[in-house]
């Protein structure tokens, strides 16, 4: 009964969302496809259902591994199911700590994490025998202080946090879960989420370009007051909240319906693109002066 209620609730919410975004006719057709199992949304719903039904399990154990890293080569992360944090360390060696939670014990946890050099890049992730064996996985990756050529991170269900690091290029994709960057700098950044919030927090800076897109979720952008930009935004259903003093706004469409526009500040040397199919976009500022 509980599972049925959960399923109906999810379908109802999705039906409302699709109706708002695409109209009653398209929304009804998509819901019928979901019920028939033929929609692209089915995989996403299965992930959400699995995440909910797992609940919180007992602590099963943890693994720790060290690995060499070369800042001149790309770092690539791939996790189907995990809350991932990428952090800086004053140490010269890189490491990955993983904590596992579940309802039943799992043999040989030490065989799950991997750090492999392939095609000129460092690949980090987990070889999970069965996602259903775990209720939660937390991953902490520590990288020595340096400017890395590139970071490419993919997370299926979970979250991604990157803090106090520097990159040439940074690209992330999270299907279900939030993405947050703190005190991080990069030449170019692209953040994508299917269902989840995107946050670019105080202290994070971009030299050339920043792109943030979520299908369902909010976008929060904190920008340094001295960094000139030209920002293009588009919102399917939601509103723009601009608290960046001095930014010139050009908006088309109503505040609560489909809208798009541009904001500019300073020399406009940095390109920013923000889009949310369903969700709000918030823009704030911070000072780099001490």
Model segments located where?
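Short acidic/polar N-terminal linker immediately downstream of export determinants
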Residues: 2-108, 130-144, 180, 247-269, ...
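Short, T/G/N/S-enriched strand-turn elements that build extracellular solenoid repeat scaffolds
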Residues: 63-67, 83-90, 111-114, 138-143, ...
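Repetitive beta-strand solenoid architecture
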Residues: 71, 80, 118, 135-137, ...
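Active-site alpha-helical segments that house and flank conserved acidic catalytic motifs
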Residues: 75-79, 153, 172, 233
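Hydrophobic residues embedded in beta-strands of well-ordered beta-sheets
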Residues: 94, 120-122, 240, 281
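Short beta-strand/loop motifs in extracellular/secreted proteins, especially
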Residues: 94, 149, 229
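Glycine- and small hydrophobic-enriched segments that form the cores of compact globular domains
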Residues: 109-135, 141-145, 171
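Short, surface-exposed interaction patches in beta-rich subdomains
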Residues: 183-184, 188-290
């Amino acid at each position: 009964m509980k599972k049925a209620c959960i399923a109906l609730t999810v379908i109802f919410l999705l039906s409302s969302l699709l109706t708002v975004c695409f109209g009653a006719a398209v929304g009804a057709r998509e819901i019928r496809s979901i019920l028939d199992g033929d929609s692209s949304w089915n995989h996403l719903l299965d992930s959400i259902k699995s995440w909910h039904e797992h609940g919180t399990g007992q602590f099963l154990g943890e693994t720790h591994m060290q690995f060499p890293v070369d800042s001149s080569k790309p770092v690539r992360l791939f996790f189907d199911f995990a809350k991932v944090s990428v952090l800086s360390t004053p140490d010269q060696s890189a490491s990955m700590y993983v904590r596992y939670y579940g309802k039943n014990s799992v043999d040989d946890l030490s065989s799950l994490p991997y750090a492999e050099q392939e095609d000129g890049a460092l690949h980090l992730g987990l070889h999970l025998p069965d996602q259903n064996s775990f209720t939660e996985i937390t991953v902490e990756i520590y990288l020595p202080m340096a400017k890395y050529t590139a970071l490419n991170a993919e997370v299926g269900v979970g979250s991604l946090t990157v803090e106090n690091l520097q990159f040439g290029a940074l690209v992330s994709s999270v299907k279900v879960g939030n993405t947050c960057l703190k005190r991080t700098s990069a030449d170019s950044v692209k953040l994508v989420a299917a269902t989840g919030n995107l946050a670019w927090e105080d202290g994070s800076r971009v030299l050339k370009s920043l792109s943030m897109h979520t299908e369902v979720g909010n976008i929060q952008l904190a920008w340094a007051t001295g960094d000139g930009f030209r920002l293009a935004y588009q919102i399917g259903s939601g509103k723009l909240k601009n608290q960046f003093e001095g930014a010139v706004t050009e908006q088309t469409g109503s505040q609560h319906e489909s809208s798009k526009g541009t904001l500019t500040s300073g020399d406009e040397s940095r390109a920013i693109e923000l889009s949310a199919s369903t969700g709000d976009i918030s823009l704030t500022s911070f000072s780099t002066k001490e």
